[in-house]
Structure formats: structure tokens, C-alpha cells
Regions:
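Internal mixed beta-strand/loop scaffold within catalytic domains of large alpha/beta enzymes
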Residues: 184-291
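Cleavable N-terminal signal peptides of Sec/SRP-targeted secreted and luminal proteins
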Residues: 3-20
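Generic detector of short alpha-helix boundary/capping microenvironments
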Residues: 5-8, 156, 253, 293, ...
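C-terminus-biased signal that marks the final domain/tail of proteins
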Residues: 21-195, 208, 296-473
Length: 473
């Protein structure tokens, strides 16, 4: 069995292309467009609501009537009012997600511990294990994952905004879970980053002239985490100690940072950037999921989001993709992918790929598509040796939108197993929409082999409809 942790370690290798043309696909891709499923558009206002002070929850169906996929049958959409401050926000969120949190939070870290140990001791993954910080490996092998995570919490806590610690304590109290477990859960991404695909298309690269941004999260499906998808929406700002912008985060119960998120004007996502941890990496800084959350919680343009990432005290090396409203482009739309580490931030735009990745021209890698309004990185080590995403971008340029990304790009590239999302911003600013997909099985109790998100139906939700659930009786 290959766990999500092992998948992350071996994602540093390039994925071999398939020479034969897949049915309904391009020759460089392993998957098939025929694997795609319909996109659902539920009426959120019509669902039964669970209400608590400062929050509301609806269960959004994941199972179309014409499919046999049965588990999970829904995902929780929790909308919380932040105007009472971080602690009350956390209490409301914890109350809304209590059952999910009690099942997930105490079990996630033990579930992953054995897989990390096996990966670190397996000679097949030895060189990839070296991409982990040496102090983490030492702490893990001596005292286990809890010790390694406690060290991470200690290193980052000084730089973690108090508002997030207060919200975490509120969540613990509201859900009835241990604060220490939440601290360890929220520290986990700092240790092992996921392999992902990022595509940001704007203007002439798209079918509508707006922005379509893909975030595909690849982490494997052998860990318990796949059973607990959550979408959380924050609305009703408290500018003194909380965000000033309504935003949505695709996450897991008790994970209060963000790795997939958007507001009405911009969206953000991340991908592992594998490099020697001794070079410009540190854990003495703000955990990157909280930096990502701050971008959509406080800012409304690509440029302001980029500047915030530059100004933050960063930790480990990651890619961060920010797309949406832009003050520097001719059409008011745009996006870029940041290569960030503890010391530097490099901006990859639609014109400078070969400056950012000069190795692309010297190592025999496939030619990366450079066209106006398009930036992307696939799930492999960059510069990628896999031509699938390049071929898909070339094939779909000028037609990119949520339907193409979900039903053509994702299943052919086989990316987005743990979750995937598309953020869309209308060219005229009239609508902002999120599409989300999650894994599932074809049995009622989740005991079967999970089907990756990229082969399941996605759900379309308008952000105004999401935020409106709080006031909709």
C-alpha cells in the first residue's frame, strides 16, 4: 500500500508519459476525458439547515442520481459569522463540525505515523526522505510523530497570529476535541507538503474572458483524511482581530489554515516545491497555510496578495498561485505563481517562465507553453519532465473554463485525488463561483477503494449564495 505520505515523497519524481492515446484524451496523458462526471448545481437555500449562534451548516449532496458512488453522500458546508471575534467564530465552527471533528482530529496523526516510519525506512524512498528536514527525521525516529510535530508547533507558535490560536481554542471547546490535537493537525502541512497542480487562466486564455483557476490537491487516498471533506465560509468581518473580506476555504475538520481558498475577487492555492531543506528553508516563521488564508481573508487584488506573501515571515518552500482581479493588467484580470521560501519570493507570470526555470531549456524537458493570460505548474517536480499538462493547455488554450478544467484536464492528467477546486471570476465582476470535487466509494460505508476526486462529480456554488445562507431562514 502506498500512503499519502509516501505519495508526497515520491512525487519528487517525474510521472512517465503514456505513449498510447487514452480513450477520449491526448497521447501524452495517462487518464481519459471519459472518466469525467457531470457537474451538479444544487440550490443551497433549499437544504435543511443546522443552526448555532454565529453559524449555519448545510450538507451538500455529492451523489448524483445517475451514479453508484455512495460514500460520502455529502460534504458539510459551514458558514460562520466572524463579527464576534475569533474565539466565538471557532466555537460556532466547532459546534457545526463536532461529529466530523471527533471522528477525524484524534485519528489523523496516529493514522499517518506508521506510514511515515515505513517511508523513511524504505530504501526506495531514501533520497526523497532527504527532502524532509533532518531535525524532523531525527525527532520522528527517536520519539515518534507527536514529538516531531510538537517541535514544529514550538518553532512556529511565536509567529502564528493570536487570532488563529484563539479560533483554534474556540473550535476545540465547541467541538469537544483537544486543543493539543488541533495544534498538531495544523502543524502537519509544514512538515510534508502535498503535490498539486495549479492553472490560472485569464482573459484570452479562457472561454469567457474572465478568470478560471484550477487547484488540484494530490496526497493519495490511503489515509483517513479523504473521508472528511469540509467547505467553510467566513463572513461578517471584525477588522480589529479578524479578516476584512468574506472568503471560502476547502479544508478538513479542525484545520483552520487554508490550502484552497477564494473570496469574491481572488483565489489562492499551493503546491509543494521540493528543494534541499538546508537551502533557504526554516520553520521559524508563520505556517504557510495561515499566510495563504490571510491572502483571501484580507486582500482583494492579485497585487496586494502577492505583496502580503512577500512581506510575511515565510517558512518552507512552496508554490502559491494567486489569480483574479488585478490592478496592473490591461483587462483588470490576471494571476501569477509565486515560488516562495524562507528568504526569497520569485514571481512566475505569463511571460517569464524560462527566466524562472532556465533548466527547462537545458535538461530535455518538454516545452512549457508560454501564452498570454496563462500560468501553470503540474504535480511533478519543476521544471516538469511530463508533457501531459503542456499538451492539455495547448489543446484548450482560449477555451479554458470550469467545465474544460474539470471534465478534460483533471481526469486526463489524473490530478486532484484528495480534492480539487476551480475558482471562476466573471470578466465584468458580476459573479464569483467555486466548483469543488471530493473522493468517494461505491459502497455505503466507505470501506471500498476510494475513487479520486478527479473522477467524481463536482459541485458548483455561487459565493453570494454561500454567504447568504447565514441570513436565509
Amino acid at each position: 500500500m502506498v500512503s499519502g505520505v509516501v505519495v508526497v515523497l515520491v512525487m519528487a519524481t517525474a510521472i512517465a508519459s503514456v505513449s498510447a492515446t487514452a480513450a477520449g484524451g491526448v497521447s501524452d496523458c495517462a487518464g481519459s476525458a471519459s472518466d469525467a462526471k457531470p457537474i451538479m448545481e444544487p440550490s443551497l437555500a433549499g437544504f435543511e439547515k443546522m443552526r448555532v449562534p454565529n453559524g449555519v451548516r448545510v450538507n451538500v449532496p455529492l451523489t448524483p442520481t445517475n451514479t453508484t458512488v455512495a460514500f460520502p453522500s455529502h460534504f458539510p458546508l459551514a458558514v460562520v459569522d466572524t463579527s464576534g471575534g475569533p474565539y466565538k467564530t471557532g466555537v460556532a465552527l466547532g459546534q457545526l463540525l463536532a461529529d466530523d471533528a471527533k471522528a477525524f482530529v484524534p485519528n489523523f496523526i496516529p493514522d499517518v505515523a506508521a506510514e511515515i516510519e515505513a517511508a523513511l525506512k524504505d530504501s526506495r524512498y531514501e533520497k526523497y526522505a532527504k527532502l524532509l528536514p533532518s531535525w524532523f527525521i531525527d525527532a520522528f525516529l527517536v520519539d515518534g510523530i507527536h514529538a516531531a510535530l510538537r517541535v514544529t508547533v514550538w518553532m512556529t507558535k511565536k509567529y502564528t497570529p493570536q487570532r488563529y490560536l484563539d479560533e483554534m481554542q474556540g473550535f476545540a471547546d465547541g467541538a469537544g476535541v483537544e486543543m493539543n490535537d488541533l495544534l498538531l493537525l495544523n502543524a502537519f502541512p509544514e512538515l510534508i507538503k502535498a503535490a498539486c497542480t495549479i492553472v490560472i487562466a485569464s482573459g484570452e486564455a479562457t472561454a469567457t474572458g474572465g478568470v478560471s483557476q484550477l487547484r488540484a490537491l494530490d496526497f493519495g487516498l490511503d489515509l483517513v483524511v479523504w473521508k472528511y471533506p469540509v467547505v467553510v465560509a467566513y463572513t461578517g468581518s471584525n477588522a480589529e482581530d479578524h479578516g476584512t473580506v468574506d472568503f471560502v476555504s476547502v479544508t478538513f475538520p479542525g484545520f483552520l489554515g487554508s490550502i484552497t481558498g477564494m473570496n469574491r475577487n481572488i483565489g489562492i492555492c499551493e503546491k509543494a516545491w521540493f528543494m534541499d531543506p538546508a537551502k533557504n528553508d526554516s520553520r521559524f516563521g508563520q505556517p504557510f497555510p495561515f499566510t495563504i488564508r490571510e491572502v483571501v481573508e484580507f486582500f482583494s487584488t492579485v497585487e496586494d496578495g502577492v505583496q502580503h506573501v512577500k512581506d510575511s515571515r515565510r517558512t518552507c518552500s512552496t508554490f502559491m498561485g494567486i489569480g483574479g482581479r488585478s490592478t496592473s493588467s490591461n483587462n483588470g484580470l490576471g494571476g501569477e505563481i509565486l515560488l516562495t521560501d524562507h528568504v526569497n519570493v520569485t514571481e512566475y507570470t505569463d511571460t517569464n517562465y524560462h527566466d524562472v526555470f532556465p533548466e527547462n531549456q537545458t535538461k530535455g524537458t518538454p516545452e512549457h507553453l508560454v501564452r498570454p493570460g496563462l500560468v501553470y505548474v503540474d504535480k511533478t517536480l519543476q521544471p516538469s519532465h511530463d508533457n501531459c499538462t503542456n499538451a492539455l493547455m495547448d489543446e484548450s488554450y482560449g477555451q479554458l473554463d470550469a467545465a474544460v478544467l474539470i471534465q478534460n484536464v483533471l481526469p486526463q492528467a489524473r490530478t486532484g485525488d484528495l480534492h480539487a477546486a476551480v475558482y471562476e471570476f466573471a470578466a465584468d465582476g458580476s459573479t464569483s463561483t467555486i466548483f469543488v470535487g471530493f473522493p468517494g466509494t461505491d459502497d455505503a460505508d466507505g470501506s471500498g477503494k476510494p475513487i479520486p476526486a478527479y473522477q467524481r462529480s463536482f459541485v458548483r456554488m455561487d459565493l453570494d449564495a454561500i454567504f447568504g445562507l447565514l441570513s436565509n431562514k
